[in-house]
């Protein structure tokens, strides 16, 4: 495959969620796998609902996921192209004016359904004469414009679904322009795909029906050789099978980030859920690129469980090496000669990254005294080995205490953990003790704030 060009085309009318992240990542990984180009295109022709704040948040969310566009476009800056395309379609007799109101169209659909017929537009507007149209416009009606579909079956070899086809006879001529002259999704999308030389359109299976219309639009505007390859993936749904929407606030990418989920875990879940590859932690997007294969996606619904994401995020965190998180640690003043050993000591006990701040306080800051069995702690303090300490200091120290007291298991270790860390559980003390150091250990075993 030579230099594919793909795009992710969100509407900036809200914040993107985990379901939107799926096509964004699939397109990005596809471009990186085959050394192609990934375009971010904002479908913002709806000037009333599109907001700059949403566009900005989408860019932030994509960057957090590791998605870096090669180009960014905005449809609101490209209206001249769409007007030109509409004129081409009019000149070819493929774009025609219609004057029915929404209520009139709804009545037509209901009559068709009552007769057991599919609710397809009857093309009544094609029978209007110039005088008829002039009269309707004199009454104050303004036309919306439909694309006249040619009869026949649209066929394509779908990257994911295989051989696919839709009979144009089963579809209504789609509306491309509203009464106010604004554009619906279909025309600008095709015009931009042609202009940007998009080679592959990878999107959700809810767009399968659109494909038949768009194939005809590609052919009408650019000829048979300019139709891209299509791939329609299964959609992410909730664990109960419901779809996601921009109103699903708790699963917006921004919300998942704020909850402390790892971006790599969100990416892995978005890409691997509903595929033949088990969802698993990854260390980088490059790992997802290396294993990327659209053929692994299932035809069945991809059910996403937020509870599983929490577990995946923690497992992802546990395997991240120090170099990967060095800058994130430094942002919280976790630096210096202890930082690497600290990360390797605590990462396996973290649920979210910010938990490491509390453990850094245990190592470098002060904690309130928590003492049980003060006589035993006094003995432990008096038997602390001399520094320097390494990972063997803990076993040497506790071995000596075991020999002197006969204690073992929880009776031996629990009072020491409480005194040294203030916690019931946590990282291996063999790794933490050298980081805490003898001075703090002595003070904490004595019941002092240290």
UniProtKB/Swiss-Prot annotation:
It is an enzyme of class 6 (ligase). It comes from the Bacteria. Its main location: cytoplasm. Keywords: Aminoacyl-tRNA synthetase, ATP-binding, Cytoplasm, Ligase, Nucleotide-binding, Protein biosynthesis. A motif ('KMSKS' region) lies at residues 243-247. One of its GO terms (molecular function) is tRNA binding. ATP binds at residue 246. Catalyzes the attachment of glutamate to tRNA(Glu) in a two-step reaction: glutamate is first activated by ATP to form Glu-AMP and then transferred to the acceptor end of tRNA(Glu). This is Glutamate--tRNA ligase 2. The gene is gltX2.
């Amino acid at each position: 495959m030579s230099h594919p060009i793909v795009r992710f085309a969100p509407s900036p009318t809200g914040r993107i969620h985990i379901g939107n992240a799926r096509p964004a990542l699939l397109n990005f990984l596809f471009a990186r796998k085959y050394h192609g180009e990934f375009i971010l295109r904002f479908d913002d022709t709806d000037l009333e609902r599109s907001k700059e704040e949403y566009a900005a948040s989408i860019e932030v969310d994509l960057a957090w996921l590791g998605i870096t566009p090669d180009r960014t476009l905005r449809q609101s800056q490209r209206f001249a192209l769409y007007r030109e395309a509409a004129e081409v379609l009019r000149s070819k007799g493929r774009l025609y004016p219609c004057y029915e109101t929404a209520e009139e169209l709804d009545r037509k659909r209901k009559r068709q359904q009552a007769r057991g017929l599919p609710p397809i537009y009857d093309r009544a507007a094609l029978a209007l004469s110039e005088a008829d149209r002039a009269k309707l416009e004199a009454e104050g009606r303004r036309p919306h414009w439909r694309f006249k579909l040619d009869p026949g079956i649209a066929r394509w070899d779908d990257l994911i679904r295989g051989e696919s086809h839709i009979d144009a006879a089963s579809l209504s001529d789609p509306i491309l322009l509203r009464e106010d002259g604004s554009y619906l999704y279909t025309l600008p999308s095709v015009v931009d795909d042609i202009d940007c030389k998009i080679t592959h359109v990878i999107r959700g299976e809810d767009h399968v029906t659109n494909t038949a219309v768009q194939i005809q639009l590609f052919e009408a505007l650019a000829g048979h050789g300019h139709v891209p390859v299509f791939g329609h993936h299964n959609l992410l749904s909730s664990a109960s099978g419901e779809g996601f929407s921009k109103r699903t606030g708790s699963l917006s990418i921004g919300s998942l980030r704020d909850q402390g989920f790892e971006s790599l875990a969100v990416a892995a879940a978005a890409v691997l859920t509903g595929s033949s590859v088990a969802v698993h932690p990854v260390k980088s997007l490059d790992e997802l690129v290396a294993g990327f294969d659209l053929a692994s996606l299932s035809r069945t619904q991809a059910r996403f469980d937020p509870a599983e994401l929490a577990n995946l995020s923690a497992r992802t965190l546990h395997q991240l090496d120090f170099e990967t998180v060095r800058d994130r640690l430094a942002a919280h003043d976790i630096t210096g000669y202890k930082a690497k050993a600290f990360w390797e000591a605590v990462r396996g006990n973290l649920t979210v990254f910010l938990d490491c701040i509390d453990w850094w306080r245990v190592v470098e800051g002060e904690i309130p005294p928590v003492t049980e069995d003060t006589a035993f702690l006094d003995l432990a303090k008096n038997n602390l080995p001399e520094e320097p300490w390494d990972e063997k200091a803990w076993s040497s120290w506790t071995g000596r205490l075991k020999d002197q007291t006969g204690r073992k298991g929880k009776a031996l270790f629990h009072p020491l953990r409480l005194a040294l860390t203030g916690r019931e559980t946590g990282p291996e003390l063999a790794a933490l003790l050298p980081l805490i150091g003898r001075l703090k250990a002595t003070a904490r075993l004595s019941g002092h704030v240290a």
